[in-house]
Structure formats: C-alpha cells, structure tokens
Amino acid sequence: NLERATRLVSETGGSILVITEGVFGMRGDQGKLKEIVALKSKYEFRLLVDDAHGFGTLGKTGAGAGEEQGVQNDIDLYFSTFAKSMASIGAFIASDEAVIKYLKYNMRSQIFAKSLPMPIVLGNIKRLELLRTKPELKEKLWSNVTQLQNGLKANGFEIGETNTCVTPVYLKGSVEEATQI
C-alpha cells in the first residue's frame, strides 16, 4: 500500500523502494512497468526491476522489459543475470553511479566478494556485443519461441497469456497424471 508507505516514510525520514519483475518467470507475463512508473511522481519512490527473463529477449536492443514498454529510463535500479539469455554465469545491477557506489561499499555480501573469472567476464562482454550487433540472433530466438508456443497450443496445451519467451505449460489433474505425459 503506497499510501501507508508514504505516511511511514514521512514520519521516519526513510524512502520507498518498489521492487518488481520485468517478466514473471512462472507465468511469462510482463510486469506492469508503465503503470508502476506512472505512480512514481505521486509517491516519490525508487523502482528496482529484476529482469532476469526479459534481459536479452525483450526490447529493440534486448535491454529488457523496460525497453519493451518504453520506460527503461524511468527504472532506478535494473537487475539481471547472464545465466538465462546469455547462457553464462554472473549478474549485474545498473543504476546511477552514486547508488552503485553505495551498494558496493555497504552491502555485506559485496564487501569481501570476489570478481568473476576473467574468461567469464570476457565471454559476457562478447555476448553483450552480439546482442547489440546481431539482431538476427534475437529474431531467431523469437521465431523458435513462436513455433514452440503455437505448437503447444495446436496440440491442446494451455500456455496462458505469455507474451515473452517464458512458456508455461499448465496441466490439469494430479502430479502423477502430469508426469505421465
């Protein structure tokens, strides 16, 4: 409840951080980022988007759900992973320099953390370069996703209203029945 949160921060001197996902990994639907961003000026909050399933797959350049919905520049903290669309390991958070410095020097998990091995870092940089320079790779991904989703529907499977690469398959019946497919 943002009304309640606004009252609390006015009493305590704190601030509000709204956290959501760019793509919800169980259903494949996108977070309502436009609607959330529209509330920022009224409630004065920062927005953190975990876009593990949108990064590399959504938006013109693959920048994710924020780019897809036209609100990427309104996201204050953008978090994603290289483990999904990049088929690698590691993660990143993007924000203003002051926020990144604060996190770097104040998050317990980061104070004594080690960097990723350089071959992994270089591989991730190469993957980012490919994302920017080879749009045909993302086009091929979407061609495959469309074939998969259409094929599942044509064969009577329920996949919900996904508009992303995440393709849930909803099964009716018991767990035993579902495992007998």
Could you tell me what each predicted segment is?
Residues 77-79, 86-135:
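Conserved core segment of the aminotransferase class I/II
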Residues 1, 23-27, 54-57, 110-111, ...:
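Short, small-residue-enriched loops and turns at beta-alpha junctions
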Residues 1-49:
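Active-site phosphate-binding strand-loop segment of PLP-dependent enzymes
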